[in-house]
Structure formats: C-alpha cells, structure tokens
C-alpha cells in the first residue's frame, strides 16, 4: 500500500526464496537472509555493495541451503569452479 506521497507504507513486505522462488511466509521462523559483500581486487569489502539471498525454512530443513547458495553465487559471478554432485 502507498500513501499520498507514493511511499511504501506496508508493515510487512513478503520475500521470495532465492533458491525456489516460493514466497516466505511471515511465520517461517527458520528462514534466513544472507548478505554477501562485493570485494575489490585486494579482497576488501566495498561499503554498501552486496548481494542479498533469502533462503526459506523449507530449503534449510532439507539440507539444500549450501548447494543453493553455491549455485546462486556462481550464477551471480561470485564463485568459480565449485564442485556439484548434479554436474
């Protein structure tokens, strides 16, 4: 919902799981949001530049969060040459 100035005034904005594209419900207390910082050539974090991943409790309970995070980071160009069983 927006106010008369066009600003978002929702109390709860639903998120989607980055791995499955399922909506993360408000009562999913096992879900996590992970920010991965972008780094410069020297390996130092660049302030204010990061990529956010949201993982639902469903993905975490099945033990797929590490593989999902590796896959998402490879697609975003953060990781190279990570071994995967599915390949």
From Swiss-Prot:
Modification type N-acetylmethionine: residues: 1
Effect of disrupting the coding gene: Reduction in growth rate, a decrease in free 40S subunits, an increase in the amount of free 60S subunits and a decrease in polysome size.
Post-translational modification: N-terminally acetylated by acetyltransferase NatB.
Record GO terms (molecular function): structural constituent of ribosome
Any one GO cellular component localisation term in the record: cytosolic small ribosomal subunit
Keywords on record: Acetylation, Cytoplasm, Ribonucleoprotein, Ribosomal protein, rRNA processing
InterPro entries documented for this protein: Ribosomal_eS21 (IPR001931), Ribosomal_eS21_CS (IPR018279), Ribosomal_eS21_sf (IPR038579)
Subcellular location as annotated: Cytoplasm
One GO BP annotation of this record: endonucleolytic cleavage to generate mature 3'-end of SSU-rRNA from (SSU-rRNA, 5.8S rRNA, LSU-rRNA)
One of the Pfam families matching this protein, by short name: Ribosomal_S21e
Main location as per UniProt: cytoplasm
Note: Present with 15300 molecules/cell in log phase SD medium.
Family: Belongs to the eukaryotic ribosomal protein eS21 family.
Cited function: Component of the ribosome, a large ribonucleoprotein complex responsible for the synthesis of proteins in the cell. The small ribosomal subunit (SSU) binds messenger RNAs (mRNAs) and translates the encoded message by selecting cognate aminoacyl-transfer RNA (tRNA) molecules. The large subunit (LSU) contains the ribosomal catalytic site termed the peptidyl transferase center (PTC), which catalyzes the formation of peptide bonds, thereby polymerizing the amino acids delivered by tRNAs into a polypeptide chain.
Quaternary structure annotation from Swiss-Prot or TrEMBL: Component of the small ribosomal subunit (SSU). Mature yeast ribosomes consist of a small (40S) and a large (60S) subunit. The 40S small subunit contains 1 molecule of ribosomal RNA (18S rRNA) and 33 different proteins (encoded by 57 genes). The large 60S subunit contains 3 rRNA molecules (25S, 5.8S and 5S rRNA) and 46 different proteins (encoded by 81 genes).
Protein name: Small ribosomal subunit protein eS21B
Protein source organism: Saccharomyces cerevisiae (strain ATCC 204508 / S288c) (Baker's yeast)
Native organism taxonomy: Eukaryota, Fungi, Dikarya, Ascomycota, Saccharomycotina
Gene: RPS21B
